Regions:
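Short, ordered, surface-exposed loop/turn motifs in non-cytosolic proteins
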Residues: 29-46, 159-174
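Structured interaction patches on ligand/partner-binding surfaces of diverse proteins
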Residues: 98-128, 229-280
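A short, solvent-exposed beta-strand micro-motif common in secreted/extracellular proteins
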Residues: 86-98, 199-210, 214-231
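Short, acidic Ser/Thr/Gly-rich low-complexity loop/linker segments typical of extracellular
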Residues: 36, 45-76, 175-198
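N-terminal accessory interaction module
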Residues: 54-55, 60-120
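Exposed beta-strand and adjacent loop surfaces of beta-rich binding modules
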Residues: 19, 36-38, 89, 150, ...
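Beta-strand-rich domain onsets/edges
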Residues: 1-33, 111-150, 154-163, 181, ...
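Beta-strand-rich interaction surfaces with strong enrichment in secreted/lumenal proteins
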Residues: 79-81, 178-181, 210-212
């Protein structure tokens, strides 16, 4: 007896749009962050309707069933949506359960005015490279990968004496490379970076001729801090300031000596990195690095 193959008739075709997808990027490793994050989205006008992103096969964090956007997600074509569609505001919150990256929050407006993945909109010169993804920076609890240097310390506001939280730190090497980190609520920071290239590589011709071993190698680095807490924007329902406002803070003064000394403050601090050792940056005579927003009293 021959098997009877049932006939099927297409009754309905369902089409769904993904209105928010994000590629997270690790600038220290110059690689995508494909797992380990908890990414949530909450309507500003209804904080009880938080949804969590799912991870696609390619490591993109995406959202479905976004509150208030069902019509746009299921619209068959653009003509059925209307032009332009109304926008809604949401709080995007990112946390890393394993503690590799600093948690951040940002208000986003949906639907996006462009197709494709979310691009964080920061000022020109901001460290975030939107062409690669949404950059997250190393936390103080992250273990540096092999052959990576760690520039770390504790920031203190020279005016208030309180921890300088949510500052953006930049470490620049002589070859022009820049590496970034954020200070946490206690002012602690950690900037991870690969060791700068040696001028002549091992095994090359001619070989290194200065007689120094690898563990005797040093490099000059330049540290700068962007810190202007008065310019930070709050995020509704969050204890974190807006990520974009953190990245766009103004330049701060760094005090190599205690504030009030004849040396004063500088917008950059040049110091030396030693191979194989964390570089703990501090103001002379204390364990913290004193900074202040430019224009504030000290």
């Amino acid at each position: 007896m021959l098997d009877v193959v049932p006939e099927y008739r297409l009754m309905e075709r369902v089409k769904r749009r993904t209105l928010l997808g994000i590629r997270f990027w690790d600038p220290a490793l110059d690689a995508q962050i494909a797992d380990g994050l908890r990414v949530t989205l909450t309507p500003v006008e209804n904080t009880r309707r938080t949804i969590t992103a799912y991870r696609t096969r390619s490591g993109i964090y995406a959202f479905d069933n976004i509150p208030g956007l069902h019509v746009l997600e299921t619209a068959w074509d653009d003509d059925s949506i209307g032009s332009p569609p109304p926008t809604h505001s949401y709080v995007l919150d990112i946390e890393d359960a394993s503690g590799r990256f600093s948690g951040v929050a940002q208000v986003v407006y949906l639907p996006l005015p462009y197709p494709g993945l979310f691009l964080i909109d920061s000022d020109p010169g901001s460290p975030n490279d939107s062409t690669k993804g949404f950059s997250l920076y190393s936390s103080i609890t992250r273990t540096p990968p092999a052959q990576y240097a760690c520039v770390c310390g504790d920031l203190v506001d020279a005016h208030s004496g309180m921890p300088a939280a949510d500052a953006l730190l930049r470490v620049r090497t002589d070859d022009g490379s820049s590496w970034y980190g954020l200070s946490d609520r206690e002012g602690r920071f950690s900037v991870l970076m690969p060791y700068p290239y040696l001028h002549v590589a091992y095994g090359s011709s001619p070989p290194l001729s200065d007689g120094l071993r690898l563990f005797q190698r040093t490099w000059n680095i330049t540290l700068s801090v962007q810190y202007s807490p008065a310019s930070l924007d709050p995020v509704p329902g969050s204890d974190k300031p807006s990520y974009i406002s953190i990245l766009n803070q103004g330049q701060a003064l760094i005090y190599p000596q205690l504030p009030g000394s004849p040396a004063g403050g500088f917008d950059e601090l040049i110091t030396q990195l030693n191979y194989g050792r964390d570089l703990v940056v501090s103001t002379d005579g204390v364990s913290e690095l004193h900074v202040s927003p430019i224009g504030s009293p000290t």
